[in-house]
């Protein structure tokens, strides 16, 4: 949800657009299928983190757009804070493991 909220913080998007933007910005690392995306969007909408509206495009297609709400912005700040804490802890452990491995390797040379 942090990734979806981050994308919607920049601009309103429709479902397919979210999947394509996520794929593009992550350099093909994150690829959400419709069966995964739409339940996430519905969950965020039920939590009032996002809202949706219909828009008729010039080509006649009607698309459902999603936008982040003020509550969603607060949730995103909280999620970013949690991610920073988590990633710092992982980096600390990885750094520690790398240092120990390098030290052990030097001892056996």
Predicted segment positions?
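N-terminal helix-turn-helix DNA-binding core of bacterial DNA-binding proteins
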Residues: 1-36
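Basic, amphipathic "hinge/linker" alpha-helix immediately C-terminal to the N-terminal HTH DNA-binding motif
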Residues: 61-80
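Short, well-ordered turn and helix-capping elements at secondary-structure junctions
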Residues: 22, 26, 54-56, 70-72
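Basic amphipathic alpha-helical segments that dock to polyanions
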Residues: 37-44
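Amphipathic alpha-helical dimerization/coiled-coil segments
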Residues: 74-109
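Beta-hairpin "wing" of winged helix-turn-helix
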Residues: 45-62, 67
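Amphipathic alpha-helical recognition patches that constitute DNA-binding helices
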Residues: 3, 36, 67, 71, ...
């Amino acid at each position: 949800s942090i990734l979806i909220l981050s994308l919607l913080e920049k601009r309103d998007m429709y479902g397919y657009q979210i999947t394509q933007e996520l794929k593009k910005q992550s350099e093909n690392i994150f690829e959400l299928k419709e069966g995964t995306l739409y339940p996430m969007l519905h969950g965020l909408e039920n939590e009032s983190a996002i809202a949706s509206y219909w828009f008729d495009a010039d080509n006649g297609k009607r698309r459902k757009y999603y936008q982040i709400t003020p509550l969603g912005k607060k949730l995103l700040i909280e999620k970013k804070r949690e991610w920073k804490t988590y990633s710092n802890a992982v980096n600390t452990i990885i750094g520690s493991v790398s240092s120990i491995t390098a030290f052990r390797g030097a001892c056996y040379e």
